[in-house]
Amino acid sequence: MKLLTKAWYQTMQDSGMGVMLQVDERAAECSEELFQAVWEEKLAEDLELRREMCAEFEEVFDEAQERQSFAEQHRWEMEYYRTRMPESILNQVADLRVLALGYCTEAVFRALKEYRAWCETWTEKTMDEAWKMRCSQGLESAFTGEHSLHDSVVLSLQREGEDLRMEFDREDPMERLRDIRENDPELLEEMGEEPFLFPEIRAICFRDAEILKQEQCVEKAFWLYDEIWRTEEGGFEIHALLWKDNGVFELTIRCRDTELLWTVPQADIP
């Protein structure tokens, strides 16, 4: 990726940093007594919420498991703030443990609000630049056109002679329609069949292709964002940003051309 990089994606995620924090001036001090008090307070709230949810959905409430999950989430929050929060803001935090439980001072709250605004502005500006670069190459409708692959799950990437074929996890449109017929016939009568037979990209064939960069196995990865660039030879480079449980990674494929395969014939696309 040249513009929509891993750093760009992480900054976009940071635009939500601390959005659920509450101002509590107790967070201005660092003491074991305060931390334990806040811990018990937040743990009690979490357990009560989980207990109510289990009762509503008729599930077994496992307090020991919920306590463990609470502690694991707290560790995750601490690591996130420690590694992602700007140092200038982190230095204002008296006790990271209390911050990870959801409390901060007014000064930290305001600083994070400004940082979130900067993240949002910068990521949107970069997204606009990526689109302008695509348009400047005459590639507005190239690759997938108006059909986004965002959040599509990759099933496989396999070599077929000189080509590469990438398959996506897609629901069969007829299966979707049968499900609606069985479970919501009134909706089908109201809307008709056509809205449920919408086309989706089920596979992409990269013609005369080579992989220039593949940081992880793409199987079961979520496709996030992509860029397309013309090559000097007249072909294309497809840059993709994908996500799996162990993080975001990049895939770059150079090819002569691409062919899209649909869940319904392309000629039938409205």
What are these regions (language model features)?
Residues 1-270:
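Surface-exposed, interaction-prone regions used to assemble/regulate multi-protein complexes
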